[in-house]
Swiss-Prot record:
The lineage of its organism: Bacteria, Pseudomonadati, Pseudomonadota, Betaproteobacteria, Burkholderiales. GO terms for biological process: translation. NCBIfam families: L27. Keywords: Ribonucleoprotein, Ribosomal protein. This is Large ribosomal subunit protein bL27. Belongs to the bacterial ribosomal protein bL27 family. It comes from Variovorax paradoxus (strain S110). The keyword Membrane does not apply. One of its GO terms (cellular component) is cytosolic large ribosomal subunit. Pfam families: Ribosomal_L27.
Length: 85
């Protein structure tokens, strides 16, 4: 006979890995073309001058330069720009 009861089962025991979201390059920072500026879900930050958008809403620099953040419009949208160095 068994000396211990069976272990049973659980439906827990899994978790998703971290997504590493957030601002990667801050205002005034010098970055190169193709560098990621913001990784985000949705468009919390919108692309401005010399900034591109990836399919997962990642913002990246199109030219070498300095990053700047600001707000625009009546809805105060957060904009990200890159001014060429």
């Amino acid at each position: 006979m068994a000396q211990k009861k069976g272990g049973g089962s659980t439906r827990n025991g899994r978790d998703s890995k971290p997504k590493m979201l957030g601002v990667k390059a801050f205002g005034g920072e010098l970055i190169s073309a193709g560098s990621i500026i913001v990784r985000q879900r949705g468009t919390q930050f919108h692309p401005g001058v010399n900034v591109g958008v990836g399919k997962d809403h990642t913002l990246f620099a199109l030219v070498d330069g300095h990053v700047s953040f600001g707000v625009k419009g009546a809805l105060n949208k957060h904009m990200v720009n890159v001014t060429p160095a």
